[in-house]
Amino acid sequence: MERPSLSRRTSSSTVSTDGEGVYSRSTKERKRNFIVNSRLKRGGGHVRVNRSGRLGSVTMRPSALTRAHSQNPNSSLVNNSSAVSHLTKQRSLNDLHELNGPKHVAKNGLIPLTQRKPNCVWDDAPVDNDSTAGNLDSDSALPTPSVTTNEAADSSRASSPVTRVVAVHDNKKKIINSNISNAPPFNNTDVQASARPPAAGQDDSAADASTTKSSPVHNEVMAEPLPHSNNREVTQATNQPKWQIHSGSDIASEPPTLSRGNSLSLLANRKVPSTNVKKSQAELYDLGSSTSRTQQKLLIQRASSKFDIVEDDMDTNPSKRFSNPHTKHIMDLVRTQYRNVLRTRELIPEFLEKIRSSYSNNQNFDSQNAFNTSAAGTAGTREETISNGQNGIVASAETSKKDDGVQSASLNASMSARSHARQRSIHVPKTRKDTDYESIHQKLLQLWSQG
């Protein structure tokens, strides 16, 4: 017994074969591939907001897919003050293209999320995710215990407990001192004693323990909350911590220009949604750049305004004047309508003259058809009317003045015809809305030639 194959066969209606029986994909499969490919190339909302969404696995750390590297709260401690210049450079799309290469972007149409992180990623520092951001490492913050051979130094240290020297504000000194058991009140003598070089009998390990070195990330600086937006009146001295690293003679005399609050605000400003409007024209018209929907609308508006400027300028090259194909179509329609109006203006006086001559020469006027007139009645004035048809009714009136008898007879006939026309109206066939102007003109000319 044969086992049924696991591949699902598509119906014969959706599979079409080419000339030599080549299999072509079904419409369902084609639609599915188109949707998947288009969504991947465009990058959905979850990609633009830097959320992993369905593209990444659930167990992945957020640093693998997002810019959690750049959200490190200790960024200003690790990097020097030139981090601001790095951040301003990475705000342009051109640097992103230089990261990945134009060929890579042109092939896939999407910048990989793992390569979107900036150049100034702190590789030496431990990566903090959102849950541990802002917390000090308990292992690195504690001073390393000292193992010394000098008993005098051990006894002197045992009598007075080791105090962690941290440069903080006055309102935090009480909290720190209360956490340390049996600690004397915080004063300047402790700071000077801890910053003093070691004694002559102590070795290097004791010197390391006395200066309380910590990890290179934290540098014994307490995490300070960001200044609130309403505290702008506070001076800079109260906002900035005293960046002092008590390592003997290496005490920092001047604080760096970049504080933790400023670096975080710079990083937060990179995701401001209004940055898509502040693009230059070169970036807007760059087809390789990843554009959001608002950028696409801006691009369309600018392109359409360019089209209008080109079409309004009559001195431009006529082959380039109609950049928008719809404009040429509309202008052709207007020209044909104007041509039809001019033709109608020429035809109306001829038509009126024809009716006028028929009133004057034919007393037995057929009310059902105004064009069935005798050829003998119109033979006299036909050539003159055609020759003077360009000049309209004025020229035809001058030709009718040549014969006074014909004019008086035509007036009497027209008066009698008007009295009869009140009872019997002239039947004029109605034209449909979809009737072309050309057919009407041809019909009028044909009737004129028959008359």
UniProtKB/Swiss-Prot annotation:
It is found in: Cytoplasm. One of its GO terms (cellular component) is cytosol. The target of rapamycin complex 1 (TORC1) is composed of at least mip1, pop3/wat1, tco89, toc1 and tor2. Belongs to the TORC subunit TCO89 family. Keywords: Cell cycle, Cytoplasm, Meiosis, Phosphoprotein, Sporulation. The keyword rRNA processing does not apply. GO terms for biological process: meiotic cell cycle; sporulation resulting in formation of a cellular spore; TORC1 signaling. Residues 7-17, 203-215 have a biased composition (Low complexity). Component of TORC1, which regulates multiple cellular processes to control cell growth in response to environmental signals. Tor2 is essential for growth. Nutrient limitation and environmental stress signals cause inactivation of TORC1. Active TORC1 positively controls cell growth and ribosome biogenesis by regulating ribosomal protein gene expression. TORC1 negatively controls G1 cell-cycle arrest, sexual development and amino acid uptake. Residues 419-430 have a biased composition (Basic residues). The lineage of its organism: Eukaryota, Fungi, Dikarya, Ascomycota, Taphrinomycotina. InterPro entries: TORC1_cplx_su_TCO89. The keyword Cytoplasm applies. This is Target of rapamycin complex 1 subunit tco89. Residues 1-35, 122-164, 176-264, 362-437 are annotated as: Disordered. The modification Phosphoserine is found at residue 70. It comes from the Eukaryota. Residues 129-162, 228-242, 362-376, 407-417 have a biased composition (Polar residues).
